[in-house]
Amino acid sequence: MKNLGLIIPFDYKLLSVAAILDVFDTVNRIYAENHRELPLAINIIQTPEQIKKDSNFFHGYPVTSITSDFVADIVLIPSFTTSNLKETLSKNQIYIPWIQEQFRAGAEIASFCTGAFLFASTGLLNGKTATTHVDASHTFASSFPLVLVKPDQTVTADGRCYTSGGSTSTFQLLILLVQKYCGNDIAIRIAKIFAIDLDRYTQSYFSTFRPNYTHNDDLVMRIQREIETNYVDINTIDGIIKDLPASRRNIVRRFKKETGIPPIEYLQNIRIETARRQLEQTNIVSQK
């Protein structure tokens, strides 16, 4: 069972929290109906001050203080309800050390919409790709210049860090997480229940092939991103690596060390999994 820590920050957006809870509750319900052990333990995370004030608001969920010894497998940061993000971040500074501590302990972190501002405030997104609500992307980029902001992305996944854009992008990221923790079949079923358009993904997330982004080799990461972005037009791996500051042999060795496979096989897997995603999407549409 995976421990989910859903932060309820100051100025949180209720619809964002409701969507997160609804999806993960539905996953657990599906497992319960099939007499299977529940895969997810949903925990509400708040400050001691908030717990005293909102003691009955999240009835039915364990409410855990940031001062407890709780350890999450994944921390979830919902969207904010206000446009005054500077003031909101000031209110939520208390959460930053807790998020950092959870990450150091091995947790994954996922933010939804403008929740990316709190995530980025921890410094954990520095040097990583991230997205947020399109209307807030310029402010986000200027506030956190070390973050590689991708405003056109619905979802980003970089190592143990995940972000989503605004509105229905929340569901796109939730589906990714369901797939990661519960598998393709459950993820596709959840997508059908919530009428989520899988075709909005910019990468093949529904995959038995799971690329490794947790390494620290920038050159390998650069090749991975090039393959995933331009896999249709790539004819040979030599065309990708010709301008890189290392020999072909060295690059292939490093790439295989970090990803487990050589670049050409990585390219083939990306193409296969993209085709798989398109087929799964076609099947969902035909069953509607």
Q: What do the PLM-derived regions correspond to, one by one?
A:
Residues 126-153:
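A conserved active-site-flanking secondary-structure segment within enzyme catalytic domains
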Residues 152-153, 157-193:
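Conserved anion/nucleotide-ligand pocket segment
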Residues 181-225, 233:
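Accessory alpha-helical/coil subdomains and C-terminal extensions
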